[in-house]
Amino acid sequence: KFCGAAGTTTGSQHLLEVNGTRILLDCGLYQGHRSESYEVNCCFPHFDPGEIDIVVLSHAHIDHSGNLPNLCKQGFSGNIYATFATRDLCQIMLADSAHIQEQDTEWLNKDRAKDGLPPVQPLYLEEDAERCLRQFISIGYERPMPLCDGVTLTFFDAGHILGAAQVLLEIIDKEDGNKKKRFLFSGDIGRGRNEILRDPVPVPDVDFVLMESTYGGREHELPTGATDAFGEILAEALKRGGKVMIPAFAVERTQQLLYVLNQLFHTGKLRRVPVYVDSPLAVNATEIFRIHPECFNETVYRFLFDENDPFIFEGLHLVRAVTESKRLNDSTHGPCIIISASGMCEAGRIRHHLKNGLGDPKNTVLFVGYCADNTLGRAIRDGRKTVNIFGKPVQVRANIETIDSFSGHADHSELLDWFGRMTGPKKRTWLVHGESTRSDALRDALTDEFGGAVDVAVLGETVTI
């Protein structure tokens, strides 16, 4: 049953019932406007949390993991299976999400009070996130684990973020004459050729596929030129004598940029300037990256032993304290690079840097990731001359640059390549995690190239395999 991320890219939740056991694949937050998000996330209209037996989590991104504390709070008491790195990232990301839930509820209640409506409670608190973590069981890649009667789970590297997995369920269907069925949930698929991570692993002998379609019908810039393009933009920007402000996702993108900067400085392709990572979540995530070399590609793994730490270098400052963050906005501060969350500029310390730095033509804002419609990041990327930050208009005089080749999601061609490398009959495929136009484009391409039955998932629909 498709319970989320059908016709959209957030709120991943897919319910599988086999041999009387109810298995939930992912339990993500739907992300949209505050009031709409709260209404969608507060209850589970497609199932009773207390009747779910097992959760299998593909990766730590909040649109896949973020409603787990609420699920547990509302009665789920079973095990949550994830990779070791995913569990460690969830420890910091779910706590951070709880903090955001409390802030969002505060804003939402102000609006409700104006309309004469009673206040609502946060979806969950930090203690709920902490309790939820006790239900996690960690499994390594490609190590089969019996889940329940007739079902074995195996994780395969998805190459999307640290710890991201494709979920293979090997099923002996006792309601269908003990037939063996291999069901694969893609999770989110990486591009391959990532600066840090291994490529997605082809999964063998697959019968049924539940597949993401985020970038169906859309191609990215080639990842092979990302480092050089990044270095050239930075070199030109630093010549102006200003700051380079980089809005970046705290998990994966920040660490990717740190590794690339380390390479650029190490090879002399970029002159050394101070680099500040101004995001407590990103700082914590970077520490987790260091303890999970099993997720690294061969190049980074070798660098780890030859050069020590791929994410730490001379001139790097990891900023936790608010006072230190505020000092970065001092007008006497010389040329530097500031990496700060959030990537879409909707929250976090990046908004303070933009408020103070957008008006200076010596400064540069460099976007390295996706910005959704109706976000501050999208407005700046699209060239708006005045933006609203903290309720006040801010003139945009800084230089605005964009690199799209750092994307963590496979594009259209890469999704087709991933599907083609997978072996087995692939009797039926369902597409999720994509806007309808993206899913439709990928469905048409898969059908044309590979044949077989390919359907776009419909929210609330139940199918039998």
Language-model-detected regions and their locations in the chain:
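Hard-cation-handling environments
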Residues: 233-373, 388
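Short alpha-helical
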Residues: 63, 88, 162, 252, ...
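Acidic/glycine-enriched edge-of-secondary-structure segments
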Residues: 27-31, 53, 180-186, 192, ...
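Pre-active-site segment of Zn-dependent metallo-hydrolases
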Residues: 6-11, 18-78, 82-136, 189-198, ...
